[in-house]
Swiss-Prot record:
Belongs to the CinA family. This is CinA-like protein. SMART domains: MoCF_biosynth. It comes from the Bacteria. SUPFAM superfamilies: CinA-like, Molybdenum cofactor biosynthesis proteins. It holds the Pfam family CinA_KH.
Amino acid sequence: MKSNLKHQSNDPNCKGVEILSIGTELLLGNIVNTNAQWISEELSTLGLNHFRQSTIGDNSERISKLIKEISSRSNLLITTGGLGPTPDDLTTEAIAKSFNATLSERGYLWDQIKKKLSISGSNFDRSSLKKQCFFPKDAQIINNPRGTAPGMIWKPIEGFTILTFPGVPSEMKEMWKETAVNYIKSNFSDGYIFFSNTLKFSGIGESTISEKINNLLKLKNPTVAPYANLGEVKLRLTARAKNELEARKIINPVKEKLKKEFSKFIFGEDDDNLSSVLIKELLKRKESLVFAESCTGGLLSSSITSIPGSSQVFKGSIISYSNNLKQSLLSVPENLIKKFGAVSEEVAETMAINAKEKLNSDWSIAISGIAGPSGGNKEKPVGLVYISIAGPNGHLTNIKKIFSSTRNRIEIQRLSVNVCLNSFRLILLSSSK
């Protein structure tokens, strides 16, 4: 019988799906737990909600106790980590212990491991690697095409199933796609999926957006959820439907309403970022772009060159961090720097105009500021940034921003890049070629 997890998800007392990440290295912060995030997205795609994530260290007693607790409140548990050959790989043994089960050797798995290692030319220790061949007798094995640690699908008690995967992301993902997806669809899906479409905003805060769309935040299908990142806000629209086409039909009316309300602030969707959007627009306009950077030290250039195809529109950048280079490379007069300071509208404007001319570009963006933590004063505090954008037909836009002094150096630099790119986006949006 299928476990109709999603159908029951509106019941606060219902059972559901849990993710358990196993490994002391996760608790110590030695590695980032990307597996749980990836599996969460996969579960949503399959139409399943998971209600809890846990992380636990490599301790058999604690793992066993937690799994027993999970079995009383969930239908499906997905674990990652602890399937390797070392003494601290304890997942399978701990799971078996939770249900007083014994482990038996699967001889064919040992043959597979030896074959894989002989092909790769690796030496192997029989005593350590062989522990990966022991499973509960009625467990279904999940083959590992990329490594030596198989996983399993096991139903130790009625109404509770465990899927185990290694902690190596590349191995886990391939095993998931080859085995877990079909198994979950066949045994736990009610035929519905979750589909999400994310709108991305810049130049407006999360609280302002939330105030304006308070009624939309109460919707049940689709749901509307805001998320704030440094310099941008995301609105995730999620619908539950039989397929993606139906889900889009549910989402689209809400999306169009949001686009009408926030047309100036929405710069893209899903995988878009400000750099990719700007590159597409410049390609369409057949225009080029250069930078003259000071306080961002190349971060602005990096944001553009990280996008494939950027070389078709981005010519390069002059990183004039010192005053001497501002003078020698960008022809900023020494007396201008002495009179107004390197961090000033006048200097940023001169940097932009001269960079555009020297590098023969349609557009240029220049930035000079105080990223901190030192270097500021009462008149020019840490967080002060001047941006100048020069373009065709004598276009010139000057921008002054003062970011909070509570921001650290990297945050001020990243926010400065965001303001540069978003300001340029708005200029392109308002000008037609």
